[in-house]
Amino acid sequence: MNFFESLDTAAWRNQSRLCVGLDPEPARMPDCLPKDAEGIYTFCAAIMDATVDLVCAYKPNVAFFEAHGAAGWSALERLVKRRPGPPLILDAKRGDIGSTAEAYARSVFTTLGADAVTLSPYLGSDALEPFLRHADRGCFILCKTSNPGSGDLQDARLADGRPLYLAVAEMARDCWNMRGNVGLVVGATHPAALADIRRACPDMLILAPGVGAQGGDLEATVRAAAAGDDPRLIVNVSRTVLYADRGANFAAAARTAARQLRDAINAALRAV
């Protein structure tokens, strides 16, 4: 089963388009857990177990594990190996040239065993190809990101008047998706850009981070990005789920938050 089949299976089984981002910030974690690599492993594993029937995917951000050195990377490896069912998208934002890109692709897909990865397109097609050739894995191209400064470059206008983010989306559609394993990362904080990209790429999967703590509006995101009966949309939420409670019942609180978000996404989809 390839990544997209695994994603569709989890989405159908759990009636969910929610992806939970695993961004374990020690300062925000429950007080009952240690703030070291073992603590972030325990925290993320508990979140996954509590939400396994409510999500379509998980998205661990590699930076929060790398910050703990070798022990943090080991914690990430353990999480990937013990994932409970829904596929895992490694939020690594890789992008480099030649043999370096080849090594990154081996690290992500062969050594670690992630189901999908986020990629930066700005070094060009040759930097993406080592990942793209893994046809059974997902490759999510950073297109219009959710951060406030994304417009510094991504909104820049080309000679033909298109914003750079739209050119990236169209290249993903026409050049990089030959194996059918490419999706786009488009921030929920930019609903107008979401709508532009959906019009240009009606058949591509969109991963939309930024709902919740970053200020993205769920209903506006769904209206802009959903694509008919098969919405081709994953809504990623991190902090609202992870840090729903800092007490010993943090996992139960995360489950409640995830259920509410899943149901809200489904309600928004029905309203489109």
UniProtKB/Swiss-Prot annotation:
Q: Which InterPro entries match?
A: Aldolase_TIM, OMPdecase_AS, OMPdecase_type-2, OMPdeCOase_dom, RibuloseP-bd_barrel
What pathway does the annotation place this protein in? Pyrimidine metabolism; UMP biosynthesis via de novo pathway; UMP from orotate: step 2/2
Q: What class of enzyme is it?
A: lyase
Q: Which domain of life is it from?
A: Bacteria
Q: Name one GO biological process term.
A: 'de novo' pyrimidine nucleobase biosynthetic process
Which catalysed reactions does the entry list for this protein? orotidine 5'-phosphate + H(+) = UMP + CO2
Q: Name one GO molecular function term.
A: orotidine-5'-phosphate decarboxylase activity
EC numbers: 4.1.1.23
Q: Which HAMAP family match?
A: OMPdecase_type2
What family does the entry list?
Belongs to the OMP decarboxylase family. Type 2 subfamily.
Give the protein's recorded name. Answer: Orotidine 5'-phosphate decarboxylase
The lineage is: Bacteria, Bacillati, Chloroflexota, Chloroflexia, Chloroflexales
